[in-house]
Amino acid sequence: MNNFDFHSPASVADATKALGAGDDGCYLAGGQSLLPAMKTGLSMPTDLVGLDKIAQLKGICTSAPGAGRPALHIGAMTTHAAVAANADVIRLIPALARLADGIGDSAVRARGTLGGSLGLNDPAACYPAGVLGLGASITTDRRSIAADDFFKGLYETALEPGELITEVIFPIPEKAAWMKFKQPASRFSMVGVFVSKGPAGVRVAVTGAGHFAFRARALEAALEKQWSPASCDGVAIAPAGLNADIHASAAYRAHLITVLAKRAVAQTV
């Protein structure tokens, strides 16, 4: 691991200032991906800006009455374990609690964060499918970014240099479910599918199958006509452009998308 300067700010303003003052700095959230990358030399930042002491970035709350449509607000530094155990998440979006509870193992869930997962945008991560599948918005220190505009490519997002995720706002769906076919050793998604019906319409978001999370438009169109498991029958997902590796071929992943979407919808009816 290379030498670096460590900063521990207590506010978002101080965090962005510290990062801007460094030559090649990184924000440190839970460290579940960044620290292993630093240990192997894949990432060599000159400065690490720890976010753990910024209270503004932690916590879960609901929109105040009269603030428009009800929504769930989750701070970027909220851990997976906290999301999974939160009473409001379990009551309002139980599928999101289930998603968080299935990430990694207990050690990963105790340290890993919502904002860290989204900022990295690992192609097999769970949260991108949940955020995209619920039509959430990502709030940063500069602006609000719709989920549809956030995920750009392999480990690539709409975030600009130095931009910091502060919270994610989830609209409350009428129905939602999450299904994951996991790689047993890592518990990452070989394919994961999040379905929802609500203020953002019908959405089917997929992770693990492509270079980044995406919406399965053919399945959405079928479910718009009728929200039932049978609507997924006969919807073929093209394997072209999907991931293929030692765990699964592109054709198998394409098949899993439809199978998991059908199972997810079945959970909601």
Task: Describe every region a protein language model picked out.
Residues 1-269:
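C-terminal structural segment of proteins
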